[in-house]
């Protein structure tokens, strides 16, 4: 009797789709292997095992290639796969994770047997023996040496990968990361030993080989190696003779062509130095010439192969120097430079995918561990360990970082290293780059290879994305916390939640000094003041400070920044929004720390205009600091001052809005959000608004109630005010013109207008905590000796008869900025005949300008000033460029209307367009003007007061470089660029002036 199976009963063998196989040929490949012919439990288990491989299709393709190779012994392998779960786990995991190891198995088809049975990792000694024995064997047959040694190396990597990956497919033990990394270093040691033996045979033949020790550095030295990595080495010989050098060179050649790249770039003097040195030569170098990074590199040094006694002598001689490196004068500067160099190595477009150098990546963890080892290791031998994991553990045990934080950092580090291993295994290529996050197939493969499984809310790829985000954020937070939390614990009161073991005050001071603080004792006092009071503020500060202090340590002046933060926090103690904003908006905190740690000018403004801090965040269209238009600020300032009949209150209102706008401009400038031309225009706009407000207030004050002003007054901006090119420290150069009201004589109008103008100058110039508001009218006819205010007719008569060359030159930048606009325009039309005469200015006037310029260069530079670095009057500085432009205007403006312009930069454009000066030379002038203006603005931002002289090398110059928008905080590099740019511009200036 035939029994028909119910239609709903599913076959025991899973379908290709259920197995997750997506290759169109997958079904045919399974059939070719004979795995779909039987539906017994063994075949079902086999197929489900295959489906769990990170890339089951890739694994299946290699299995078919193995089946087709007669040397594989397919029947034996097939039977073993059906019956041995551990073999399935290792083999399928390897074939689904590593295309290169799959190719190795196809080329060496008997190597699958290495994954069979009770597989254990060989010891370091066993590895050395197997590699060296093979080297001895192949030395007589060099033609096969590379192939056989490489196959042995790959076999050992295969076994390790099989054990490392097996848990992704079957319920096999998980190998700890530390075991994997240490075994990879053991394999590397054995490979180096084999290469050394072959090199000795090749170079020395029957002679006794030289005593040569190979010191492993980097990850190999620390026994935390990657699957694919350069192996960094240093060679130490008893005698640095030609034989030793040849052996070392041959060893590198053999190892690099057979196993992995061997790099001796960490040796003294790097690639320019001798390949081999004696112990004594190494000692001499490290005592006299070595940089901080070279001592940092020695943290990982280990005698790997070669002469063991010589290797130990090297370590015994040099390691004590490592633990005193933090006492070197340049230690802090070099550490800060190393931090920045790492950050700048990664292009912005791939930073989020960089496992090693990206934010919250492996280098962040390694840098923390190594810096803290260097700082505290001189007084604590428990920190004398090589690997990152061991270092973090020791730092936790010693109280230098919290134990829980150390455990979390280790967990994040091991997770990121696991991903790095999986990425490298795929093609046995050196890489640290995660796949594009929208590459679903690649992300899914990596997740499965890393044994990440779906959780019900996310598939494996989604889980990996979430885990990466979590780990990067955790590392970034811990990066700050590990440096500063123990410091806070050492100063916090017992009642505060953060109080723990902390570290000694001496250790805390050492650590702060290493992080860039020149006054670590004072810094600790500031930190204590911030957390040593009761209530919510202290608790919030204790949470905020690790991150804020970390950001501050990247600023040019962390000492000044911490003081400014303390002052600001104390001033805003009653403002609940302040700490809440810093807590909830990291962007605000990061930007604020940069500003406080760079500038003395802006923090003083923020103390009295703290609301600007709320605009340090981002809005929907970008930074909130840029949402304010200077023109809108000017209108608001004039309107606010206009509400008061009392001139003092009106000017006070204008000062308040000016203060807020200066804080906004300075902040945006320091944060790199504004171009220098935008800064100059914004500063000019707010100055003009203040002038307008003050003028209106004084006119109201001098006009009887119900009466009318005796005159109309216009304020003419001169110099940089007229050109809309003011800097932070600029005075307002002005002239006043008046026109009598109906029925008022010229004399009455001038007297009344003079009183108004004097009051404007006096009230604005009243000493204040704000940046000064100096009004300078010395560019008026006859200078200080001439009347402060004139009528149009008086100006016309004077300029027609008495105008001197310098007065004509000054008029080139005259522009109506405040007061009666119509009167101002009539004044400009009047002086056009003087500054742009139809036939051009006289040759005598041009000659006089040249003479005055020469006198200015020799007499006006302040005593003691460096002419090369004085931004205003120095070589190729602002005065040089502006005088050059003005000379060309005087000579050519009567023919070229585009030169009727008060802006230096716009006039340079016109000069280039008219080909008065070669275009490349105009570019030099423009670059010098922009460079000097940035530097001059930066000087005020950094020092908090007007100054024109660049400082010498040191912290202040570094801060000026940062404030000027230089791409790093290397003040020397910034200064070199300034000198180069201004020197080239000076050559053009001399050419134009004919000198």
Curated annotation (Swiss-Prot):
It is an enzyme of class 2 (transferase). InterPro entries: GlnE (IPR023057), GlnE_rpt_dom (IPR005190), NT_sf (IPR043519), PII_UdlTrfase/GS_AdlTrfase (IPR013546). Keywords: ATP-binding, Magnesium, Multifunctional enzyme, Nucleotide-binding, Nucleotidyltransferase, Transferase. GO terms for molecular function: [glutamate-ammonia-ligase] adenylyltransferase activity; [glutamine synthetase]-adenylyl-L-tyrosine phosphorylase activity; ATP binding; magnesium ion binding. This is Bifunctional glutamine synthetase adenylyltransferase/adenylyl-removing enzyme. Its EC number is 2.7.7.89, 2.7.7.42. Residues 1-487 are annotated as: Adenylyl removase. GO terms for biological process: regulation of glutamine family amino acid metabolic process. It catalyses: [glutamine synthetase]-O(4)-(5'-adenylyl)-L-tyrosine + phosphate = [glutamine synthetase]-L-tyrosine + ADP; [glutamine synthetase]-L-tyrosine + ATP = [glutamine synthetase]-O(4)-(5'-adenylyl)-L-tyrosine + diphosphate. Involved in the regulation of glutamine synthetase GlnA, a key enzyme in the process to assimilate ammonia. When cellular nitrogen levels are high, the C-terminal adenylyl transferase (AT) inactivates GlnA by covalent transfer of an adenylyl group from ATP to specific tyrosine residue of GlnA, thus reducing its activity. Conversely, when nitrogen levels are low, the N-terminal adenylyl removase (AR) activates GlnA by removing the adenylyl group by phosphorolysis, increasing its activity. Its cofactor is Mg(2+). Belongs to the GlnE family. Disulfide bonds: none annotated. It comes from the Bacteria. The gene is glnE. GO terms for cellular component: cytosol. HAMAP family: GlnE. Residues 492-995 are annotated as: Adenylyl transferase. SUPFAM superfamilies: Nucleotidyltransferase, Nucleotidyltransferase substrate binding subunit/domain.
């Amino acid at each position: 009797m035939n029994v028909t199976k119910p239609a709903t009963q599913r076959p025991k063998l899973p379908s290709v789709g259920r197995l997750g196989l997506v290759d169109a040929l997958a079904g045919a490949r399974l059939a070719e292997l004979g795995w779909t012919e039987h539906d017994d439990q063994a075949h079902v288990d086999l197929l489900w095992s295959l489906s769990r491989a990170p890339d089951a299709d890739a694994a299946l393709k290699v299995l078919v290639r193995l089946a087709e190779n007669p040397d594989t012994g397919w029947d034996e392998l097939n039977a073993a796969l059906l019956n041995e779960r551990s073999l399935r786990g290792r083999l399928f995991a390897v074939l689904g994770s590593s295309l290169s190891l799959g190719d190795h198995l196809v080329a060496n088809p008997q190597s699958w047997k290495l994954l069979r049975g009770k597989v254990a990792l060989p010891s370091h000694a066993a590895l050395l023996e197997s590699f060296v024995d093979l080297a001895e064997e192949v030395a007589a047959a060099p033609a096969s040496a590379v192939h056989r040694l490489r196959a042995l190396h790959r076999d050992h990597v295969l076994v390790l990968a099989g054990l490392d990956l097996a848990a992704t497919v079957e319920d096999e033990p998980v190998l700890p990361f530390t075991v994997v990394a240490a075994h990879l270093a053991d394999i590397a040691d054995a490979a180096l030993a084999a290469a050394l033996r072959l090199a000795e045979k090749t170079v020395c033949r029957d002679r006794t080989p030289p005593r040569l020790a190979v010191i492993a550095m980097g990850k190999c030295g620390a026994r935390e190696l990657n699957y694919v990595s350069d192996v960094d080495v240093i060679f130490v010989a008893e005698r640095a003779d030609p034989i030793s050098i040849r052996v070392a060179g041959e060893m590198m050649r053999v190892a690099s062509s057979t196993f992995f790249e061997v790099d001796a770039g960490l040796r003294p003097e790097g690639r320019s130095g001798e390949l081999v040195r004696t112990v004594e030569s190494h000692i001499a170098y490290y005592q006299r010439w070595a940089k901080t990074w070279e001592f940092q590199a020695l943290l990982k040094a280990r005698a790997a192969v070669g002469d063991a006694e010589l290797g130990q002598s090297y370590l015994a001689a040099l390691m004590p120097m490592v633990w005193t490196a933090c006492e070197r004068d340049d230690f802090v500067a070099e550490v800060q430079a190393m931090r920045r160099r790492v950050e700048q190595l990664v292009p912005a477009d791939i930073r989020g995918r960089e496992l090693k150098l990206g934010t919250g990546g492996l280098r962040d963890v390694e840098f923390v561990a190594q810096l803290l080892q260097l700082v505290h290791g001189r007084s604590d031998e428990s920190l004398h360990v090589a690997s990152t994991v061991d270092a973090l553990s020791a730092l936790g045990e010693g109280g230098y970082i919290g134990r829980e934080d150390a455990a979390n950092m280790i967990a994040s580090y091991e997770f990121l290293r696991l991903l790095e291993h999986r990425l490298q295994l795929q093609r046995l290529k050196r890489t640290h780059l995660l796949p594009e996050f929208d590459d679903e197939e690649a992300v899914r493969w990596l997740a499965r290879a890393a044994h990440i499984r779906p959780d019900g809310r996310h598939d494996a790829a989604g889980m990996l994305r979430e885990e990466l985000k979590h780990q990067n954020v955790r590392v970034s937070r811990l990066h700050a916390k590990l440096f500063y939390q123990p410091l806070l614990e050492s100063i916090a009161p017992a009642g505060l939640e953060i109080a723990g073991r902390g570290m000694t005050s001496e250790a805390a001071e050492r650590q702060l000094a290493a992080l860039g603080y020149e006054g670590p004792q004072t810094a600790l006092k500031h930190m204590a003041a911030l957390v040593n009071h009761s209530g919510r503020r202290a608790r919030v500060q204790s949470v905020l400070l690790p991150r804020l202090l970390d950001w501050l340590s990247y600023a040019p002046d962390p000492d000044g920044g911490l003081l400014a933060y303390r002052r600001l926090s104390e001033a805003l103690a009653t403002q609940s929004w302040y700490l809440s904003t810093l807590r909830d908006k990291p962007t605000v905190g990061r930007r604020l720390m940069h500003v406080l740690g760079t500038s003395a000018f802006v923090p003083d403004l923020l103390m009295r205009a703290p609301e600007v801090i709320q605009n340090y965040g981002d809005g929907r269209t970008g930074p909130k600091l840029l949402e304010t238009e200077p023109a809108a600020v000017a209108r608001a300032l004039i309107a606010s001052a206009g509400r008061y009949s009392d001139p003092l209150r009106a000017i006070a209102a204008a000062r308040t809005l000016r203060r807020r706008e200066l804080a906004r401009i300075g902040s945006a400038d320091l944060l790199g959000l504004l171009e220098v031309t935008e800064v100059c225009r914004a500063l000019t706009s707010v100055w003009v608004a203040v002038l307008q407000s003050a003028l209106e207030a004084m006119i109201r004050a001098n006009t009887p109630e119900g009466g009318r002003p005796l005159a109309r007054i216009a304020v003419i901006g001169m110099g940089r005010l007229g050109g809309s090119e003011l800097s932070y420290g600029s005075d307002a150069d002005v002239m006043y013109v008046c026109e009598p009201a109906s029925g008022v004589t010229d004399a009455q109008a001038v007297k009344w207008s003079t009183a108004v103008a004097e009051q404007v100058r006096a009230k604005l110039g009243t000493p204040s905590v704000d940046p000064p508001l100096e009004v300078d009218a010395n560019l008026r006819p006859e200078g200080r000796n001439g009347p402060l205010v004139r009528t149009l007719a008086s100006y016309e008569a004077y300029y027609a008869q008495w105008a001197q060359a310098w007065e004509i030159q000054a008029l080139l930048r005259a522009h109506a900025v405040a007061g009666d606009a119509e009167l101002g325009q009539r004044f400009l039309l009047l002086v056009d005949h003087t500054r742009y005469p139809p036939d051009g200015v006289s040759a005598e006037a041009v000659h006089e300008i040249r003479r005055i310029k020469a006198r200015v260069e020799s007499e006006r530079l302040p005593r003691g000033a460096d002419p090369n670095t004085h931004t205003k009057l120095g070589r190729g500085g602002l005065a040089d460029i502006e005088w050059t432009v003005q000379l060309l205007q005087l000579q050519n403006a009567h023919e070229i209307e585009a030169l009727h312009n008060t802006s230096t930069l716009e006039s340079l454009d016109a000069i280039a367009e008219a080909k008065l000066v070669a275009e490349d030379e105009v570019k030099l002038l423009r670059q010098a003007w922009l460079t000097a203006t940035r530097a001059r603005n930066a000087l005020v931002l950094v020092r908090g007061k007007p100054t024109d002289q660049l400082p010498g090398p040191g912290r202040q110059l570094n801060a000026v470089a940062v404030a000027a928008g230089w791409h790093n905080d290397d003040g020397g590099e910034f200064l070199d660029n300034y000198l180069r740019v201004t020197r080239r511009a000076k050559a053009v200036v001399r050419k134009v002036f004919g000198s």
